[in-house]
Amino acid sequence: MSRLTKQQILEQLKNGLIASCQPVDDGPMDSPEIVAAMAKASVIGGAAGLRIEGIDNLKAVRKVVDVPIVGIVKRDLPDSPVRITPFLQDIDDLYHAGADIIAFDGTDRVRPTTIEACARRIQELGAMSMADCSNYKEGMYCQELGVDLIGSTMSGYTGGETPDEPDVQLVRDLVASGCRVMAEGRYNTPELAAVAIENGAYAVTVGSALTRLEHIVSWFVTAIDDRKTGA
């Protein structure tokens, strides 16, 4: 398999939209064939890159697109809240399945594999790395380790109530400190995605608003229910 160089990946992603094609778990669209179709449609629509979860899904998508792919594996562990690419074997599997960028949880939480070990393994493989972080301190630490992209992915998801709006301030702060930032997390309208780029994000990832049909339909239904008259 021929691979894109780091420079080629960065050039393609600059100021671009990454479509996260992750259907609802065990839903009617949760199959590699449908994920591959989602991915192909996203690229036709102009997505600069894709974020794909799962080895089978990644293999199916890699066959039909040539844009950069951020690969992850999600797991539910009994002894750790970390879900995103928690093991070194996950990193190896993602690389061999065709991921150009391998994303892992960069939060400061109990975990089966250290952040340092994850970053080092990705570097050894020659892939690009992305750390899904929840705050400024985590992002800066991952940058010091040489991680290529710092994601705001986990902001609002490590405890307490999840805000409705994305954490644009975190993007600003990380950019101001020299990080190459992937804005991610609740960028669920075109306007919010544009705000991320305006505030210095290298690229922006959008997921549920593009590819989780169950969520999108429920947003419309809820809005209609809230405005019902004469019921």
UniProtKB/Swiss-Prot annotation:
One of its GO terms (biological process) is carbohydrate metabolic process. Pathway: Amino-sugar metabolism; N-acetylneuraminate degradation; D-fructose 6-phosphate from N-acetylneuraminate: step 3/5. It is an enzyme of class 5 (isomerase). The keyword Isomerase applies. Its EC number is 5.1.3.9. GO terms for cellular component: cytosol. The keyword DNA damage does not apply. Keywords: Carbohydrate metabolism, Isomerase. It holds the Pfam family NanE. InterPro entries: Aldolase_TIM, NanE, RibuloseP-bd_barrel. It catalyses: an N-acyl-D-glucosamine 6-phosphate = an N-acyl-D-mannosamine 6-phosphate. One of its GO terms (molecular function) is N-acylglucosamine-6-phosphate 2-epimerase activity. It comes from the Bacteria. Belongs to the NanE family. Converts N-acetylmannosamine-6-phosphate (ManNAc-6-P) to N-acetylglucosamine-6-phosphate (GlcNAc-6-P). This is Putative N-acetylmannosamine-6-phosphate 2-epimerase. It comes from Glaesserella parasuis serovar 5 (strain SH0165) (Haemophilus parasuis). The gene is nanE.
